[in-house]
Structure formats: C-alpha cells, structure tokens
C-alpha cells in the first residue's frame, strides 16, 4: 500500500473506534466512506486480502443469499469477510474489508474468501476494483423507480460491470429472462441455474419482462414459477431459457416448508444434495439454490449445505419468526411488487389471518410508493376472519390501497400495537 492507502486505513480505524467506543454505534458505512474520501481506489488494494471472492446482486434476496454463502464457506474452514449488515454500496464493501484485514492477514493465503452483497447500480464501481472470481445474479424486478429508473438501465449497468471484470464467472438465474439476456451479451464464463420443472405454485399477475430480449416478440412459457421466472422461449427468433448447468429438481412443499434437490451438473450422473427448508416461499428455493451453487463453486463440500441452512439466522426484518401467546408471528421485508406478492403468497399458504402492513418512504425505501398498486392484495381479501392493520410513515396510503382490495385496515402507530392485537386475538 502507498502512503495514501495507509492513511485511509488508519482514518477508517479511528472512525470505527470512535463510533463504537464513544458513540456506542456500529459504524455502518461511515468508516468505509471516510477511507474512500482519502483514497477513492482503496478497494483495488484491499482486493488482494482475499484469495477468492463472490459478489451477489439482484432485486430480491441479496442479503439472505450472501449470508448463506458466507456461512457455508466458513463451515468449510475458510476465513470469510462479508458485509453481513447489508451495507451493499462500495463504502460498505470497503468497510468490511478494512475491519477484517488483520484477521485476513493472519489467515495466510489459500483460504481467505470475500462474500459481498452489492447494490445493482454499484456493481459497476465494485467489480472493476475487486475483480471477484464469481458474480451471482439472482433476479431483476422493478424496484424504487425514483432511484433505479427502468429495468433496462439496471441491465446496462450490470452488463458493463461484468465487461470491466472479464475474468469473473457469472452464476445467474436462467429462469429470469432479464438475467439470461445479460449472460448472452457479456464475454464472461457463465453458469446457468434454475428450477427444472413446474412447481405448480400460484403465479403472480405481475410480469416485468415477458418479451424477447433479442427481437421484442412476446415470450411463450412452458410454465411460470412467479413473476417472469420460468421456462420461456421466443416463437419468433428461437431465443429460449439457456440449458441449466446447475439444476433444482423435485421441489415439494410440505407443512414444514419446501424441500428440493440440488443437482451440480446437467446430466443424471451429476452429484446432488437434498435440501429441506423451513420456509414456504418459492423465492427462498431460488435464494438457497443460488447460495449453495455459488458455495460449491468456492470449494464447499455438499455435506456442509444442509447444516448451514439449519443453523441460519435471518437478518433483521427478514423471515423472523416468534411464538407470542401461542401464536406464530412472522415478520418479513418487501421493497417491490414481486417481492411483496411473494409475501402475500406466503401468508395465503400459511393461513395467516392477522396481518399488519407497514409502508415507509425513507430515502433507503424510495419515496415513490405507487408500486403498492401493483401488489396483489386481492389474493387474501377473501380470507375468513382476516384482520388487517396499516402502519408506517405512509400508513394512510397503505390503508387506501387495502380498501381498494376490499380489505378494511385500521391504522396503528407501531409494531407493539400489532403484537398487542395478536395477544388479544389469542386471549
């Protein structure tokens, strides 16, 4: 490292110490941001701290997938650095590496792995500097239009990021035509994964891309999993879902959650692993599959996969589950129509009768909340005995949307009121 890089590292350490010791705060992205003010190219130097690395991006599932990869790699005996808190812009990646650099240096070469969640629009800043060995592309849906714009802009950014890191292997969800079209246009080596066969779940009314990326003709589907995900082909030019190199098969939903097989090859003789989850959302099948296919590419033995999932603790706001007054209470996070529709489907599958919907418009959430009119709340409107609440900074907007869906929702001020309603209902 040169003098500027050393000064940036020292300044970051001082900032982190001050935030934690004096202000009693975790620090977040501030240490990384301070370091980058001094040395904007610091990430290029820090990249040498790890022997292999993977960057994970996509509209939904980044935090879950990256944390599962990190857990699986750690279980295999490697030293792992991961931005687990979801600080997924360049300062967050820099901050994670700075905080872990002493441990990475002690670990020595060969077993140091970086696992980094990255915001879609920041991939073009992170990939050229980090030059990860692998890049996982989960899905692309409409998300925060006031910041992201249209999906084709996000596609352009991700494709350009990959072009600037040509040695990076792309691991992508081939069931999503938006992801497959990126893979088709970049020079990177790629690994296509997806669900091999129909799961016969209830598909959404939302579709972000059912048009061919090559000729713009409408795509035809042999089956749809949800959103635009499924087995597609273009009747006009012949473009179709790529052959799956990594496959998810035998997907079954039980009372306990989804179970499925991961097949690490394209033929019947390929190694496989059976996975049982405690989640009833099909989106988690994709997240777990992406995580474990990536972990396998990083050298993780299949024997570590199920124990990793069994021990997994979701990040704050995601898939939290508690027992309150004899009732199972689940909390989840959705930031776009398809993600929200997946939660609606989970509510319907689980038979949930008391629902509290909190809608916020903070900068991190996006100020444009019109997307809630694309969420299929009508799907649960006929639930017998349904009790609904609306909260958050845009509680009244949520209440109106629910009213249009035929759902009467009372306004509540905080989560405590919702928990109180659970206790009252159980009494």
Stretches found by the model and what they are:
Residues 66-75, 252-271:
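Acidic-glycine-rich active-site phosphate/pyrophosphate-binding loop
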Residues 128-131, 161-166, 183-187, 349-351, ...:
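Short, conserved loop/helix-junction motifs that constitute active-site signature segments
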Residues 129-139, 228-243, 273-310:
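A conserved, hydrophobic alpha-helical segment in the catalytic core
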Residues 196-257, 278:
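Cys/His-rich short segments
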Residues 315, 333-415:
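Active-site beta-alpha connecting loops in nucleotide-dependent enzymes
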